[in-house]
Structure formats: C-alpha cells, structure tokens
C-alpha cells in the first residue's frame, strides 16, 4: 500500500507551496487507494503547538484534504507529533553510535568556525577531521571535564558514491566525500531534522517521500542514516518549488513588499484588504497575504478552484487541459508528469480559475456563500430575506468572482458606499451640463410608473431622444451619481435593483453637492 506524508512545522500558517506539496502527496495516495499521513514536526520546544497548529489543520479541512492518520484522527503508527517520539530518536541515535555510524563530538562552534576559515583561505572545501571525536567514555569524560558539550554526528563515508533513484529527477549521484558529518542530536539528546525525519518515515511506514526540491541535498545523508539503521528506503520524488510572481526565486511569505511590485499580486492583495476592512475581519497582517492559504479562505475563494490551480504548478496532463474536478485530479495525477523546473505563481491566472468556478455554481449556492460576507459588511441582517442579495447576484453575473466580491457592490445595500473620486471629478464636477441633465432626468424617473430594468432603459433612452443627446452623455454621470462607482454591472439593472426612491434620492443628493 502506498503511504505518503506531509510533515509541517506548527508555524501558524499554511504556505501555498506547502499545500501544493501536500496536494501531490494526497493525490498520489488517493489514486492508489493508499493512505495520506499528517505528521507534525514540532521539535521547537519554545512554540505554542496547539495555537500554531490550528490554522494548519483548519486550512486542510477547508481544502477538503482529509488525512488517514495524524492529529485529531490518530492511527496505529502514532504518536504523530515529533515532540512525543523522543524515545524512538534516542534509541536510533544510540544504535548509530554503537554500530560506528555516528560519534559523539565535543568541538566548540568557534573552533569549527576557525577550521572553516582556514580551509577557505587555502582554497579547499572544509571537511571536519574529527579531532574532537570521543571514541570512548574516557575521552568523552575528559572533554566534559573541560566544559565541552557533546553532540552526536554522523560518521559519513569518505569514499564512494550515494546513488538516489528519484521519480522526478532520475538518477542522482552524490559523492560521499562532499558530505559533512552532520549533527543529528543535540547535547541534551534531542534530535535534529535528519534523524527525526528518517526514523519517522520508517516507523510510520512511509513508502513515498514526495517533497520540495530544496530537500534533495538532504537525501544522501538521510539515505546513509536509513541504511545504517537497516531500514528499507522509501521511494523519493523531489518536486520543483513554487516560484515568486514573474520571477524564478522561491515564493516566500517574507518577501511581501517585493511581491507588491507585481501588478497582479498587488491587485489581489489590495482587493483582499478591501474585503477584510469592509467585513470587519480581524486579520493578522503577518499572515493575511496571497502567499498563505488562509488569505483565500478569508476572502471567499472556492477551495476546489485553489487546488485546481495549485495542481498545475509543476504538473500538466497534456499541455492543454487545465480544469479538473477533485475526482478528475485523483484519477489523472501521476508523478511522471511533474516538471523539474520551478513553476511561477500567477495571481491573475489563479483569480481566473476562481472566477470560472464561481460562475458555474447554482444561484442558491452563490447566495449561500456570499451571504456571510454581506452580513459581516452590514449589507443585510441575519434572518433577512435574500431578495435584494439574489437580485444583485443575478445582475452582477460574472463580475462577482468570489464571495467577498460582494463588497464591490456596497451601493446596492447601503447609503454609506464608497465614491470613486476620480470618476466623480470627471463625470460630474468637471462635466459641462451634467448637473442640469441629471436634474431633468430625475424628474422623468420620478414620474416612471414601472421601474424594472427594461422599463428604466426605455425611460432613459426616451429622455435622451427628447433632449437630443446620446446616451453616453448621461449614462456615466448617472452611474456615479447613483452608485459612486466608475463601472459596474448593467446600468439599468443597477437602477432596478436600487429602486426608484433610492435612485431619485441619490440623484438629488448629488445635484445638491454640485451646487
């Protein structure tokens, strides 16, 4: 049985790149009828694990990516937190020491730094000569008496090669001489990443280690640990990393200021911030950004649309097909179609996927998803009927690309809507005759007996004919006067949704402001 895993650290957020890696593991397991395991790498004792883990688990649940074993669901191979597996790591370290594949080392950091600098001056690669290695208890006691602290290092081979068969990279050959004697346990006995990861993968019976390419340099030393402990090696597959928008560097949550210079990224972030502000969301500025999954959940993205887009970051079925249901992803996904090159994160394409998916929803589902945002923004109250909301959604059509986009149509619900100052200046304040035309049109609208979209259109067009003007000479001023916006869904649909009383009152208020 195929068993894959995703092993996040409890950082308090779920990174887009991490989710893409988790998705590929999840799909591989699902397709084969295997199991997907969630393991928590929580060896940092200073971190509040429960608080930091919750957003990660919530993110996976929102995405619909269930796990067969791990936090909250348990399983036969637990515990699933590294902080609870100390005995296993200590036993593995002791076996490596006993079998001569590791040693206790008492070098001080500053001594190692001096050796590195000397090697650098001589133009040579630094290779630790093990001069502070304790080969027996007497030597260890001597070093301890000097106030030194002993760590556990791997005793790496100095000759030969490590040959790694990677499902994506092919055959990868690493010269053992290029590997350092890596530290695998601290002086207090607590494990470091390489030891813990190998032991966990073995004891959790992981068959396929599918992870980002940045871990490829770790693989030879992990192979050495596994073979030294007598473990069967898993199958390795190293994915291309997710690159930043318009660039080749790895996507990082720490480079938000840089990404804001990318137009599409900046537009997405600004829109998210607008939704958060209007809906009174309590968001963390450090984690509310498009590099992290929670951003999309907060602003009303569809999880399936996000997963569909992430699937294509490094994978392709035939170079043409882009839209997949979750069932189709599971059916079609194979590792042999994963690219080696990094895939650049494209905010505009992601939004396009979201818009297409949202447009395919039923009217009832769209209303269900949008309603919480409308309530949070104060557009409707809990328990209110949805007539106005449904009318706005019907009129907005594909202009509404995600649930949070309802904030763009605040003018349909409330009178404290935002006003586009540039549009106001251009279409009203500095437009010759706009005030007079609006005043005349308003009297015509007040006299209208029917105010549905079709009748309003007839009324406005008849007014233009009687005034000898083209509709373009009044329609833009009319939109700004009644909505404050430079653009939106159909003008006559907009007027019908607002209703005659609200339309005429807003025109009167606008005229008064132009006096």
From Swiss-Prot:
Residues that hold ATP according to the record: 253
Q: Does the keyword Cytoplasm apply?
A: yes
| Coiled coil regions, renumbered to chain | none
Q: What are its E.C. numbers?
A: 6.1.1.17
The answer to whether the entry has keyword Ribosomal protein is: no
Q: Which UniProt keywords apply?
A: Aminoacyl-tRNA synthetase, ATP-binding, Cytoplasm, Ligase, Nucleotide-binding, Protein biosynthesis
Per the record, the major location class is cytoplasm
Segments carrying motif 'HIGH' region = 8-18
Entry superkingdom: Bacteria
GO cellular component terms listed in the entry, alphabetical order: cytosol
Instruction: Write out the GO MF terms.
Output: ATP binding; glutamate-tRNA ligase activity; tRNA binding; zinc ion binding
Q: Where is this motif: 'KMSKS' region?
A: 250-254
One GO biological process term: glutamyl-tRNA aminoacylation
Per UniProt, what is one Pfam family of this protein? tRNA-synt_1c
* Reactions listed under catalytic activity: tRNA(Glu) + L-glutamate + ATP = L-glutamyl-tRNA(Glu) + AMP + diphosphate
Q: What is this enzyme's class at the first EC digit?
A: ligase
Please report which protein family the annotation says this sequence is part of.
Belongs to the class-I aminoacyl-tRNA synthetase family. Glutamate--tRNA ligase type 1 subfamily.
Q: How does it assemble?
A: Monomer.
User: Would you tell me the protein name for this molecule?
Assistant: Glutamate--tRNA ligase
